[in-house]
């Protein structure tokens, strides 16, 4: 006999579950009030009895802390229950264990576990629970899952999916595949949101394997455009917080994000899944912090802009060289060279009668070779003075000790990071590979190697408080940057991106290069593209072919390339497309230009036609819904119902980096894509 066989029975059961959740929320609210009242009683007692003995104070302090902790737990439970009221669950499997064929357990799956103490059973299982993995991994028939007690084998007899909104069941589908196509198609056909959403209802088998991978110390996810890699990485974080509760918390995780807009765009996913948001930072901030924020430097955004607007072959060569493994090898050789050649010991007159010989000082420099060079001076000073104490019964003052340390430090010719970095390029015979800009501004590509040298000389100051590091847009970071990350963050890592979407092809990394940089790592691939229609994905594939990409069979309009007589008519044409968007059922439109300066110029030109257009720039900190004009660089990782790409002529899009930008722009579109250009310029070679 199937439990809740009909849709009517399922709807009745849903209301029973919601009623039980309501009752539990009311109970927890009463419990919260009781804890608050008790804490107030303790407070009043302490105020009115100031002469109580220390033993009683200690006892009361323990009671207060205990009540406070219990109260926080109850508040957290109430918060979680409130989150599942609207959508208690989304799936169900009926599982029969092999060892007990007399019992069939209906497993309802939702965002959170809900245990009913009256019935003494789970009414809802958390999607991250071991038993819930079968919902994503198995069809009807034989199935298995890993539990703390070992592998559990059995049979899935029934599989259902529900769409529940605001406590009402809109429909129910019997499902015989991993996630029913109807559900997935309905989700994919919906409009883009102003924030990334959780995808627990539509997680696919290959995505689930990535989410639940607990073995890889470094997990590298190569995911094609629209494969959901960022969302999957965030669901992976939520899973790890659940599976390793007590070992890791939200504050122990760090996300390296490409920009503030993207960080804002993804900020809702973890809270939707019942977890706190995690700290985020940027690669630039990390590298600058290593260097004590001493140097002014070109940002990554500024580097990309220069490559798009005024590239020179010398600039490209400098970036390419510093993104090579040969460069890292040469740096390592130079660090060894400094060890053997940059310390020149001299005699030091300690007192009127005692001189420390240069040879003895040099011996101590070698004695402490396990220490980073700049950490050695303190240890050497202490050891030398200890020897002086033993041999001459000499005791020195703190100022005298500091003076000796200063003398020893001066013997090392590498106390200035920037100078030794310049020395390095002279040493390898490539002085032209280092160039500062006006006002001594460093090029972006020099920031990581400078930090690498600094760490080699000063010690790595590992950030041990971070227990899991998530790096998004992995392709935009070079091997030397990953080497710095390896030294700073010895924790587990999830690294994700797409080699086809680099906005800096001259200094980018593939999954294989990242694996080589870390000398370890498991590469997992996401090849199915879900974001765009089949027609848009096929169009983008012509710009930048990727044989591994599998488009989903969701059909829509063919992308349009609209020619105009001149620039003025092109602007008018874009304004007409904006008006058409306003009259459509779509809610987000991205007008994606090659560069930010082009985006700013277009905003000015379109102002006479519309006042509801927002510019998303490098200075922006939040993603806004509606009509947005932005650059391809800033649009990376975002998605829109409709996309317009202006100025798609050969004058504007002709280089390798231009091609990458065009591909990124085209793959932002979910449902509709239009490209415009003026016929006064030749048509684009990539279209």
Set out the residue ranges of the language-model regions.
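P-loop NTPase Walker
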Residues: 1-33, 40, 184-303, 636, ...
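Extended, charged low-complexity regulatory segments
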Residues: 1-200, 204, 208-212
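Generic detector of solvent-exposed, compositionally biased contiguous segments
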Residues: 54-73, 211-217, 222-224, 228-231, ...
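A structural signal for short, well-ordered beta-strand segments and their strand-loop junctions
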Residues: 92-94, 220, 255, 674-677
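Conserved phosphate/pyrophosphate-binding and hydrolysis machinery centered on Walker-type P-loop NTPases
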Residues: 189, 193, 321, 370, ...
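Short, well-ordered alpha-helical scaffold segments within catalytic/effector domains
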Residues: 196-200, 204-208, 234, 238, ...
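Alpha-helical nucleic-acid-binding subdomain
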Residues: 241-469, 476-484, 492
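Conserved helicase motor core of SF1/SF2 NTP-dependent helicases
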Residues: 246-247, 251, 260-276, 281-286, ...
């Amino acid at each position: 006999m199937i439990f809740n066989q009909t849709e009517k029975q399922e709807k009745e059961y849903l209301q029973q579950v919601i009623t039980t959740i309501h009752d539990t929320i009311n109970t927890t609210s009463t419990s919260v009030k009781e804890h608050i009242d008790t804490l107030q009683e303790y407070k009043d007692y302490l105020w009115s009895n100031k002469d109580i003995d220390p033993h009683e104070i200690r006892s009361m302090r323990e009671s207060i802390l205990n009540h406070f902790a219990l109260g926080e737990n109850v508040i957290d439970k109430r918060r979680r229950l409130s989150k599942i009221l609207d959508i208690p669950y989304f799936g169900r499997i009926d599982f029969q264990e092999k060892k007990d064929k007399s019992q069939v357990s209906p497993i309802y799956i939702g965002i959170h576990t809900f245990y009913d103490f009256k019935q003494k059973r789970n009414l809802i299982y958390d999607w991250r629970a071991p038993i819930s993995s079968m919902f994503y991994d198995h069809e009807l028939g034989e199935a298995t899952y890993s539990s703390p007690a070992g592998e559990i084998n059995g049979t899935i007899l029934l599989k259902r999916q529900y769409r529940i909104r605001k406590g009402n069941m809109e429909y129910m589908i019997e499902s015989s595949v991993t996630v029913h196509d109807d559900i997935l198609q309905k989700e994919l056909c919906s409009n883009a949101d102003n924030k990334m959403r959780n995808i627990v209802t539509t997680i696919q088998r290959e995505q689930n394997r990535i989410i639940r991978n607990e073995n890889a110390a470094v997990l590298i996810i190569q995911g094609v455009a629209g494969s959901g890699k960022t969302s999957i990485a965030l669901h992976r974080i939520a899973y790890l917080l659940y599976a390793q509760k007590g070992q890791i918390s939200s504050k122990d995780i760090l996300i390296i994000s490409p920009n503030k807009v993207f960080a804002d765009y993804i900020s809702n996913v973890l809270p939707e899944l019942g977890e706190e948001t995690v700290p985020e930072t940027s690669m630039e901030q990390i590298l600058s912090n290593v260097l004590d924020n001493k140097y002014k430097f070109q940002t990554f955004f500024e580097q990309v802009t220069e490559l798009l607007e005024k590239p020179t072959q010398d600039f490209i060569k400098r970036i390419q060289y510093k993104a090579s493994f040969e460069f890292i090898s040469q740096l390592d050789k130079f660090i060894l060279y400094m060890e053997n050649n940059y310390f020149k010991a001299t005699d030091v007159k300690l007192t009127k009668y005692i001189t420390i010989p240069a040879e003895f000082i040099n011996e101590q420099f070698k004695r402490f070779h396990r220490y980073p060079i700049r950490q050695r001076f303190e240890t050497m000073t202490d050891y030398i003075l200890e020897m002086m104490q033993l041999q001459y019964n000499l005791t020195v003052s703190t100022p005298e000790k500091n003076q000796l340390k200063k003398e020893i430090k001066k013997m090392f010719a590498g106390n200035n990071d920037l100078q030794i970095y310049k020395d390095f390029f002279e040493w390898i015979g490539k002085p032209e590979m280092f160039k500062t800009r006006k006002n001594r501004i460093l090029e972006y590509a020099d920031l990581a190697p400078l930090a690498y040298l600094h760490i080699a000389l000063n010690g790595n100051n590992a950030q041990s408080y971070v227990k899991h590091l998530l790096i998004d847009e992995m392709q935009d970071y070079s091997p030397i940057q990953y080497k710095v990350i390896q030294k700073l963050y010895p924790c587990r890592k999830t690294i994700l991106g797409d080699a086809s979407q680099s906005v800096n092809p001259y200094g980018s990394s593939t999954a294989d290069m990242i694996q080589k940089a870390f000398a370890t790592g498991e590469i997992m691939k996401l090849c199915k593209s879900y974001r765009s229609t089949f027609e848009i994905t096929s169009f983008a594939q012509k710009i930048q072919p990727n044989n591994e990409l599998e488009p989903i069979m969701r059909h829509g309009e063919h992308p349009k390339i609209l020619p105009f007589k001149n620039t003025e008519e092109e602007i008018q044409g874009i304004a007409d497309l904006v008006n058409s968007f306003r009259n459509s059922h779509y809610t987000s439109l991205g007008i994606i230009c090659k560069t930010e300066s082009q985006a700013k110029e277009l905003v000015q030109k379109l102002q006479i036609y519309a006042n509801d257009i927002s510019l998303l720039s490098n200075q922006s900190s939040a993603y806004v819904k509606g009509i947005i004009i932005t650059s391809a660089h800033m649009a990376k990782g975002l998605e829109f119902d409709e996309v317009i790409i202006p100025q798609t002529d050969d004058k504007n899009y002709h280089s390798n980096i231009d091609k990458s930008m065009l591909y990124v722009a085209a793959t932002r579109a979910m449902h509709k894509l239009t490209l415009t250009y003026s016929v006064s310029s030749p048509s684009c070679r990539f279209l």
